[in-house]
């Protein structure tokens, strides 16, 4: 019997620079010959690296990846601020950063590590009354997005270069979803009084998916293929709860099971390796959060 979700799953794309996340989706729709393609976590055109894309029923799973952690390698230039907080904007402030010493930089980096309040860039993809902030800015509106809590668990300076009054920092950042790396660059420059902006960004991880999983977009256009099946995606993303085939049938119909003392969301997997659903204990029920294989398929 054919598996109804055999063509569903995730593609971990190594996004090239100069392309929007939606551009990637459009190209993969053609490559996979389906409209059911979507992505989790927007990458700016200048950024490269991990972009997780759902195919067919995998698109419905993407909502359960939104709150995951992410990791980036980036380059921050100290000595100038721009309108967009990255290299593509116009310079609005500059100052000589050559006098900064390592201790000053370390102190400022430390102040932006941990649980912090961060104000997203005005040209972000955040929606304000149904319209993205960057679209409002492009239309001439003044956009002010309130600061919100984010977590920066790792903010390490890997290398430092000094030239022409600028200090370029190669950094590695691990952070919660919703953290803007160019906002970190802006805030680091502000803390040091010299301005700062992002000049390079590469996303290396989205939750459990890394650059090792990523396939260059050009390769996918020549040979469209999943990085992970829907079964593999659920089992990779969440702790596995082994269930019987009968329990799997019940979950596929949206029924609940008896509680097992679980904490958090688990992937319910049958002995044959089929990931049936994401489940979570709610009161006296083990209920479905997302059904990967509904019996209606």
UniProtKB/Swiss-Prot annotation:
It is an enzyme of class 5 (isomerase). The active site is at residue 44. Pfam families: TruB_C, TruB_C_2, TruB_N. Keywords: Isomerase, tRNA processing. One of its GO terms (molecular function) is RNA binding. GO terms for biological process: mRNA pseudouridine synthesis; tRNA pseudouridine synthesis. Its EC number is 5.4.99.25. It catalyses: uridine(55) in tRNA = pseudouridine(55) in tRNA. InterPro entries: PsdUridine_synth_cat_dom_sf, PsdUridine_synth_N, PUA-like_sf, PUA_sf, tRNA_psdUridine_synth_fam2_C, tRNA_psdUridine_synth_TruB, TruB_C. Belongs to the pseudouridine synthase TruB family. Type 1 subfamily. Responsible for synthesis of pseudouridine from uracil-55 in the psi GC loop of transfer RNAs. This is tRNA pseudouridine synthase B. The gene is truB.
């Amino acid at each position: 019997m054919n598996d109804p979700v055999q063509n569903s799953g995730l593609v971990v794309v190594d996004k090239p620079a100069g392309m929007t996340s939606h551009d990637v989706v459009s190209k993969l729709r053609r490559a996979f010959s389906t409209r059911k393609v979507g992505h989790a976590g927007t990458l700016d055109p200048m950024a490269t690296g991990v972009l997780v894309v759902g195919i067919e029923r995998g698109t419905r799973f993407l909502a359960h990846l939104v709150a995951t952690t992410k990791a980036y390698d980036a380059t921050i230039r100290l000595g100038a601020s721009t309108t967009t907080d990255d290299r593509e904007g116009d310079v609005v402030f500059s100052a000589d950063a050559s006098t900064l010493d390592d201790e000053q930089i370390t102190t400022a980096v430390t102040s932006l590590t941990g649980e912090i309040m961060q104000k997203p860039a005005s040209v972000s993809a955040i929606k304000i009354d149904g319209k993205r902030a960057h679209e409002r800015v492009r239309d001439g509106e003044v956009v002010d997005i309130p600061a919100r809590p984010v977590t920066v668990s790792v903010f390490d300076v890997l290398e430092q270069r000094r030239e022409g009054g600028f200090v370029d920092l190669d950094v590695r950042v691990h952070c919660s979803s919703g953290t803007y790396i160019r906002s970190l660059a802006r805030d680091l420059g502000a803390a040091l009084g010299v301005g700062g902006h992002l000049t390079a960004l590469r996303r290396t991880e989205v939750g459990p998916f890394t650059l090792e999983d990523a396939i260059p977009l050009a390769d996918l256009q020549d040979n469209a293929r999943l990085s992970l099946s829907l079964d593999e995606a659920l089992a990779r993303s969440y702790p596995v709860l082994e269930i019987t085939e009968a329990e799997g049938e019940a979950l596929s119909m949206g029924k609940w099971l008896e509680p097992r003392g679980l904490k958090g969301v688990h992937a319910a997997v049958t002995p044959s390796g089929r990931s049936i659903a994401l489940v979570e204990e709610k009161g006296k029920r083990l209920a479905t959060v997302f059904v990967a294989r509904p019996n209606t398929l």
